[in-house]
Amino acid sequence: MPKYYIITYGCQMNKSDSEKVAGILENLGYTPSEKMEEADIILLNTCSVRERAEEKVFGKLGELRKLKKRNQNLLIGIFGCMAQRMKEELIEKFPHVDFVLGSYKFTELPKILESLDGKKKVVLAEDIPSPQDVDFRVIKRENKFQAWIPIIYGCNNFCTYCIVPYLRGREKSRDPEEIIREVEYLASQGVVEVTLLGQNVDSYGKDLGNVDLADLLVEIHRIPRIKRIRFLTSHPRDVSDKLIRVVATHPKVCPHWHLPLQAGSDRILRRMGRGYTYSEYKALIEKIRAEIPKASFSTDIIVGFPGEEEEDFLATRRALEEIKFDTVNLAIYSKRPGTPAANYEDLIPYETKKRWFDELENLQRKIIYEKNLSRVGKEEIVLAEEVNPKNPRELSGRTENYRLVFFEAEKELIGKFLLVKITEARLWSLKGEVIREVDL
């Protein structure tokens, strides 16, 4: 039987897309290959959010050139956001690539594979990407107890730095009944935790008119075998009081919020087109904490946006000190072709951006370690997810607040909920001891 190998770059939505592609290929008779060198088809699911993500793909394509020389029958395909952005340019730069599929076009994979003859190159990408769903029963999930579930595609916000709306299209919500059918099916297959995905997940239902994310969470909460529900990514401007109340009053909905701040300076937030001020963002955090005291928060911060000055950077630093996020994803600004910010000329020298980045990273290290220290001695319910690759005697899993915990346990407990006593604080994780298995 022919073998496939998929390499995934980027966000959780890309991970979900790769699971769909794996399911499509297995439906065609392919089996997964543990080693890239032994595969008959290699697919790269790509990301264009930052230049560095694209550079990783270029490096991998250079590596695959050598593999193709050794095996002329090897098929190499590229899909995802980078494929949507570059289209034919990828074939021109890397002639050993056989096909390029833009956003959502991986659904055409069966036809593409049938049409390839070893000489013909295929590029399939729409100017305006339009989502196409895959039968959820054929999706090859990464594991048997957790599942990604896209509920809304695209984004309407058009932040000045972001290329995603151009590559993923406008917002399009999935039918709520179809989503519920998918969750019910997954529950019947043993899934206990679902994560609802969207580039802007709390915009769900705006284009449908009669449902929103809060309504959907309530419906999924009614499904008995589902024990945990997560959702991401949220735009701060779209978090409603209704959504906060639903998270507060429905115990299966994890009280973890991913709310990208991007900057603590109102001037830079305006330039980014984020649609809120720092004081409005902070008020939202305070409102959530007042209603959900155990809520945790992660965020994204862009360092060195064009025109950023020292006082803007210091405002962002103060924001991190005031809010004390549980996780901060820091990124140095990366110019993306076709976005309004790509035309801004007041660029920041790399040395300045790196200094600011290092300063924020060091600050966040202190904050997260202090937060982790405060967990020592407490008991947490953890879903055991996988064997620790650095220590086969340990498993790792996450709390409802998305804190990573390592603990000694047999691998047979993977997929189970465990009561774990936290015994040690580490920089990015916690260490614990299993007390017992729990039935939620």
Curated annotation (Swiss-Prot):
Single GO term (MF): 4 iron, 4 sulfur cluster binding
Stored SUPFAM superfamilies: Radical SAM enzymes
UniProtKB keywords: 4Fe-4S, Cytoplasm, Iron, Iron-sulfur, Metal-binding, S-adenosyl-L-methionine, Transferase, tRNA processing
Any Pfam family: UPF0004
Cofactor binding summary note: Binds 2 [4Fe-4S] clusters. One cluster is coordinated with 3 cysteines and an exchangeable S-adenosyl-L-methionine.
Span of domain Radical SAM core: 141-370
CC annotations in GO: cytosol
Residues binding [4Fe-4S] cluster 1, per UniProt: 11, 47, 81
Record's catalysed reaction(s): N(6)-dimethylallyladenosine(37) in tRNA + (sulfur carrier)-SH + AH2 + 2 S-adenosyl-L-methionine = 2-methylsulfanyl-N(6)-dimethylallyladenosine(37) in tRNA + (sulfur carrier)-H + 5'-deoxyadenosine + L-methionine + A + S-adenosyl-L-homocysteine + 2 H(+)
UniProt entry tagged with the keyword Isomerase: no
Needed co-factor(s): [4Fe-4S] cluster
Localization of this protein: Cytoplasm
The protein's Enzyme Commission number: 2.8.4.3
PROSITE patterns (alphabetical): MTTASE_N, MTTASE_RADICAL, RADICAL_SAM, TRAM
Annotated ranges, domain TRAM: 373-436
InterPro entries associated with the record: Elp3/MiaA/NifB-like_rSAM, Methylthiotransferase, Methylthiotransferase_CS, Methylthiotransferase_N, Methylthiotransferase_N_sf, MiaB_methiolase, rSAM, rSAM_horseshoe
Domain of life (superkingdom): Bacteria
Domain MTTase N-terminal: 2-118
UniProt binding sites for [4Fe-4S] cluster 2: 155, 159, 162
Role description: Catalyzes the methylthiolation of N6-(dimethylallyl)adenosine (i(6)A), leading to the formation of 2-methylthio-N6-(dimethylallyl)adenosine (ms(2)i(6)A) at position 37 in tRNAs that read codons beginning with uridine.
Subunit structure: Monomer.
HAMAP family: tRNA_metthiotr_MiaB
Family, similarity comment: Belongs to the methylthiotransferase family. MiaB subfamily.
Protein name: tRNA-2-methylthio-N(6)-dimethylallyladenosine synthase
